[in-house]
């Protein structure tokens, strides 16, 4: 990736905040392996830089959604353990073995097909984590008998290693009994067979709210980056997480709309008086969505309204007269109390903080801050 960029919109990523959040989980669960979830490009932050920094701060295990994500980490020197949480097509099993990546076993049928596709040339081990469906209703084995049968199949092959078993909570970020019921179901199933090296069920919410002594690993995702999975979780815990992302754009032009003049597609905003506007080089192609019309951004400490429709590449803001080209504008802030916090943006978009971060597109350069050091990655100029 290039360390150069040629546009006036970018993300700031605070690596020290990410490391601090990782240490929060290490402290909460001192006897458990923290499987840092860096899928979806580390929730938009940039998986390679984040994984490297976490390794420097003690991370030994990562989780991703796809083999492609795992291979990307391997290609950039990430040597720690990696688990693919999603389903790999059985025909591609040799690639996982080649790159020393652990895989999820979602069903007995998948395991049988995967074994058929292991070439005779492969002598390396294949680490497997069996997924149990305890109530999420997605991937995984639902009954104890099938779980035991899958373990027996794995044990028939010297090359295969039954390394882990896990489940995923559906409602850990909400009040109610379902999470407790899932956890009990998980324990009951796992206790009916031999236990692997890793037993894990806690996502970010589960890791913040539950002890789960039966398990010896946790899988925090969104909260590694400084964000609570829900308002309910934030209110229930005393743990302080540090938000790690800012979205910045610099004004590229200012101009004055006269009374009666409109701006942007559909002419949805018409000035009633002479109005100074600032044009920002960012739009919905960057993940700053059309629905953000009517929201507010921070321009030199002033809360300024987004007017007119957000375009693919440009956003228009009503600003004080003294604003000029080059001024910095905060669209997403890394302070939880800010009117531009990820949570405020998520509420405006009628979604969750996860989606806001994941929507921030690859064409935005990422500027990483590690104390006094600064690094840039630009995926468009690889």
Curated annotation (Swiss-Prot):
User: Which GO CC annotations does the UniProt entry carry?
Assistant: cytosol
The reaction(s) annotated as catalysed by this protein in its Swiss-Prot or TrEMBL entry are: L-alanine = D-alanine
Look up the EC number in the record and give it.
5.1.1.1
Disulfide connectivity for this sequence is none
Indicate the residues that form the catalytic site: 39, 265
Q: Which NCBIfam families match?
A: alr (TIGR00492)
PANTHER family in the record, alphabetically? ALANINE RACEMASE, ALANINE RACEMASE, CATABOLIC-RELATED
Q: What is the designated name of this protein?
A: Alanine racemase 1
- List the gene name: alr1
């Amino acid at each position: 990736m290039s360390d150069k960029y040629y546009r006036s919109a970018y993300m700031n990523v605070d690596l020290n905040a990410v490391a601090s959040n990782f240490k929060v989980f290490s402290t909460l669960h001192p006897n458990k392996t923290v499987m840092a979830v860096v899928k979806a490009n580390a929730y938009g932050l940039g998986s390679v830089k984040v994984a490297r920094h976490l390794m420097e701060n003690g991370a030994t295990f990562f989780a991703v959604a796809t083999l492609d994500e795992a291979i990307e980490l391997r290609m950039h020197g990430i040597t720690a353990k990696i688990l693919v949480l999603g389903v790999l097509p059985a025909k591609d099993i040799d690639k996982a073995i080649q790159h020393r990546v652990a895989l999820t076993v979602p069903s007995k049928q998948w395991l049988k097909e995967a074994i058929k596709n292991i070439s005779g040339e492969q002598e390396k081990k294949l680490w497997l984590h069996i997924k149990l469906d305890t109530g999420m209703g997605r991937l995984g084995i639902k009954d104890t008998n099938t779980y035991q049968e899958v373990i027996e199949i794995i044990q028939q092959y010297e090359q295969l290693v039954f390394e882990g078993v896990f489940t995923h909570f559906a409602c850990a970020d909400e009040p109610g009994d379902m999470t407790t019921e899932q956890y009990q179901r998980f324990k009951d199933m796992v206790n009916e067979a031999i236990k692997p090296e890793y037993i894990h069920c806690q996502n970010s919410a589960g890791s913040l709210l539950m002890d789960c002594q039966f398990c010896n690993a946790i899988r925090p995702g969104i909260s590694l980056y400084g964000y609570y999975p829900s308002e309910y979780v934030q209110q229930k815990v005393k743990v302080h997480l540090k938000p790690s992302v800012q979205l910045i754009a610099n004004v590229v032009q200012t101009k004055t709309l006269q009374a009666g003049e409109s701006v942007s597609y559909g002419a949805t905003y018409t000035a009633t008086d002479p109005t100074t506007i600032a044009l920002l080089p960012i739009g919905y192609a960057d993940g700053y969505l059309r629905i953000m019309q009517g929201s507010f951004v921070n321009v030199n400490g002033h809360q300024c309204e987004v007017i007119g429709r957000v375009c693919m590449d440009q956003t228009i803001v009503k600003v004080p007269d003294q604003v000029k080209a080059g001024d910095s504008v905060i669209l997403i802030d890394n302070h939880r109390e800010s009117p531009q916090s990820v949570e405020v943006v998520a509420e405006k978009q009628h979604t969750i903080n996860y989606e806001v971060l994941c929507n921030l597109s690859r064409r935005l350069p990422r500027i990483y801050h590690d104390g006094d050091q600064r690094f840039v990655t630009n995926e468009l100029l690889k």
